[in-house]
């Protein structure tokens, strides 16, 4: 059975589930999962775990993300992105300055509250929000706390047809809706807005510049080249690391707790650069949560 992490470049027009389904066929392996959903129209890094590496999938899902995209001021859509229908139109004054936009973007730094868009997979009363939206129903949506580490404009403003668009880059915690961030920024500036393009450039320590498409992976498998499979250690890149000595490693292999002078809730424990376990803080000690020996 093959095992490892794949840095997949998801292309537009497919869901994250579609990507997993196709990889199962390519690799002839059922035990495959992804570490963080991407909307169908969004391209970019989709972390994939295969075989035994699926045991670290939850830590990849929890990791921070980096996105690059484009925000359009002037009109909003039903889906908060370019795929939706026109919802509201507010012509943009060409006197709008980059200074005003940059200042508004700083207001979203740190911990913020978001309300998920109606066209999302968040469940309310056992039903996904997009199911309500498709039925023409709007329901009360639960607020969520997310964290924005960096949010910056990366291009000049382009004024066209009484609209304005510009590129941006954002680094954020899991669960952040970039579509909603684009809409909220527009509201801050006094304009209807939407996210007109998005790609995920980094997730769980994996970078888009080194990601492979499904076609590229299929070609390598055909050639019996499995070098694209990264070690399971890549699945815990976002966890704080601790290097154990031989005695500690033996204790962990038996499932015993360790006394460690650390404060983090979770630790990725290594011995000689090999992942030994994920340790979880319990009172004054650390208990092996998952052992990989």
From Swiss-Prot:
It comes from the Bacteria. Keywords: Isomerase, tRNA processing. It catalyses: uridine(55) in tRNA = pseudouridine(55) in tRNA. InterPro entries: PsdUridine_synth_cat_dom_sf, PsdUridine_synth_N, tRNA_psdUridine_synth_TruB, TruB_C. Its EC number is 5.4.99.25. One of its GO terms (biological process) is tRNA pseudouridine synthesis. CDD domains: PseudoU_synth_EcTruB. The active site is at 39 (nucleophile). The keyword Metal-binding does not apply. GO terms for molecular function: RNA binding; tRNA pseudouridine(55) synthase activity. It is an enzyme of class 5 (isomerase). Responsible for synthesis of pseudouridine from uracil-55 in the psi GC loop of transfer RNAs. This is tRNA pseudouridine synthase B. The lineage of its organism: Bacteria, Bacillati, Bacillota, Bacilli, Lactobacillales. The gene is truB.
């Amino acid at each position: 059975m093959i095992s490892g992490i794949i840095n997949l470049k998801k292309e537009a027009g497919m869901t994250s589930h579609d990507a997993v389904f196709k990889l199962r066929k390519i690799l002839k392996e059922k035990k495959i999962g992804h570490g963080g959903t991407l909307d169908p129209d969004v391209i970019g890094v989709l972390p994939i775990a295969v075989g035994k590496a699926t045991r670290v999938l939850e830590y990849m899902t929890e990791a921070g993300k980096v996105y690059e995209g484009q925000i359009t001021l002037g009109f909003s859509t039903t889906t908060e992105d370019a795929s939706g229908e026109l919802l509201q139109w507010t012509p943009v004054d060409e006197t709008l300055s980059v200074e005003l936009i940059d200042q508004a973007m700083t207001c979203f730094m740190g911990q913020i509250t978001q309300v998920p868009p109606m066209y999302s997979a968040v469940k309310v009363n056992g039903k996904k929000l997009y199911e309500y939206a498709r039925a023409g129903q709007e329901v009360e949506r639960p607020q969520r706390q997310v964290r924005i580490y960096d949010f910056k404009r990366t291009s000049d403003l382009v004024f066209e047809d009484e609209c304005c668009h510009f590129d941006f880059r954002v680094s954020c915690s899991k669960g952040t809706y970039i579509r909603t961030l684009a809409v909220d920024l527009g509201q801050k500036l006094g304009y209807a807005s939407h996210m007109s393009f998005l790609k995920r450039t980094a997730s769980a320590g994996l970078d888009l510049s080194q990601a492979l498409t499904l076609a590229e992976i299929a070609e390598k498998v055909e050639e019996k080249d499995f070098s694209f499979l990264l070690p399971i250690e890549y699945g815990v890149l976002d966890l704080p690391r601790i290097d154990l000595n031989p005695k500690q490693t033996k204790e962990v292999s038996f499932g015993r707790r360790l006394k460690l002078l650390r404060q983090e809730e979770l630790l990725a424990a290594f011995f000689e650069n090999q992942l030994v376990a994920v340790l979880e803080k319990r009172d004054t000690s650390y208990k092996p949560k998952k052992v990989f020996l």
